[in-house]
């Protein structure tokens, strides 16, 4: 497993809105 175990973070791009789901 890598370090991509974040169901909250989905493809975050620079300048885009961070979907963390707060």
From Swiss-Prot:
Cysteine pairings via disulfide bonds: none
Primary residence: cytoplasm
Cofactor stoichiometry and binding remark: Binds 1 heme b (iron(II)-protoporphyrin IX) group per subunit.
Recorded coiled-coil stretches: none
pH-dependence of activity, as noted: Optimum pH is 7.5.
Region of interest: Disordered: 1-22
Functional summary from the UniProt entry: May transfer electrons to the iron-sulfur centers of the beta subunit of chlorate reductase.
Protein's name according to its UniProt entry: Chlorate reductase subunit gamma
Top-level taxonomy: Bacteria, Pseudomonadati, Pseudomonadota, Gammaproteobacteria, Pseudomonadales
